[in-house]
């Protein structure tokens, strides 16, 4: 095929605009900074990955340590699953005294 008859190929790579870093230079990664830590936790209470967070390896390690410290000190729950504790409304409650066998 001649060079003149070749079809033009578009590049397959798309350009993505660079987003600002999620952690500013003034932000301290600490277990007491709940507003910062809560941005890196999913709705279920799981720690989000580096790809999702757009953090460096060092920042991700510090965030993980801070989240684990906050969980141990009960500042942050281990699980965030409200559906587990909700009682279904379709089950009727039994009326009357309960009988125990001794």
From Swiss-Prot:
* InterPro entries named in the record: Ribosomal_bS18 (IPR001648), Ribosomal_bS18_CS (IPR018275), Ribosomal_bS18_sf (IPR036870)
Instruction: Give the source lineage, highest ranks first.
Output: Eukaryota, Viridiplantae, Streptophyta, Embryophyta, Tracheophyta
- Report if keyword rRNA-binding is assigned: yes
Its quaternary organisation is: Part of the 30S ribosomal subunit.
The Gene Ontology CC terms held by the record are: chloroplast; mitochondrial small ribosomal subunit
Indicate what this protein is called per its UniProt record: Small ribosomal subunit protein bS18c
Positions of the region Disordered? Answer: 1-26
* Primary site of residence: plastid
Q: Which family does it belong to?
A: Belongs to the bacterial ribosomal protein bS18 family.
This protein's UniProt keywords = Chloroplast, Plastid, Ribonucleoprotein, Ribosomal protein, RNA-binding, rRNA-binding
GO biological process terms, alphabetically, are:
translation
Compartments where found: Plastid, Chloroplast
- Molecular function (GO) terms listed? small ribosomal subunit rRNA binding; structural constituent of ribosome
Show the Pfam families listed in the entry: Ribosomal_S18
The reply to whether Ribosomal protein figures as a keyword in the UniProt entry is yes
Where does this protein have compositionally biased stretches of type Basic residues?
A: 1-19
